[in-house]
């Protein structure tokens, strides 16, 4: 668990930190050239149904993070940022550098989707 150096008063805050760490650990495992959905990450972290929480966790990462946040996408095989925005273009560029092929803004999850333990 992350040591914050402060007295934590609420159990829910500790649980929140633990959940974020689980999510970070799973995202760290996604290999180059593969992607995982928000819901998939939530399920692997023991948080089924909390895909939006995974999205929030990715959104609140520091800009200097080394975590491959861009490998987390929606379950339809596309980027969740609005098409054409700075964030969309950055994520698309990073995925393309790893060999993800976009066709009309999407990519086949059957080809590029990550299955934990299948590396």
Give the location of each predicted region:
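Nucleic acid-binding interface residues in structured DNA/RNA-binding domains
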Residues: 5, 13-119
């Amino acid at each position: 668990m992350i040591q914050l150096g402060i007295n934590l008063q609420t159990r829910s805050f500790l649980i929140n930190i633990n959940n974020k760490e689980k999510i970070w650990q799973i995202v760290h495992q996604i290999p180059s050239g593969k992607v995982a959905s928000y819901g998939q990450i939530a399920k692997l972290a023991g948080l089924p149904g909390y895909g939006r929480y995974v999205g929030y966790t990715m959104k609140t990462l520091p800009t200097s993070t080394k975590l491959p946040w861009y490998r987390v996408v929606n379950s339809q095989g596309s980027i969740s940022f609005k098409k054409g925005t700075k964030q969309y273009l950055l994520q698309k560029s990073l995925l393309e550098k790893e060999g993800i092929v976009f066709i009309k803004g999407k990519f086949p999850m059957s080809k590029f989707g990550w299955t934990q333990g299948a590396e």
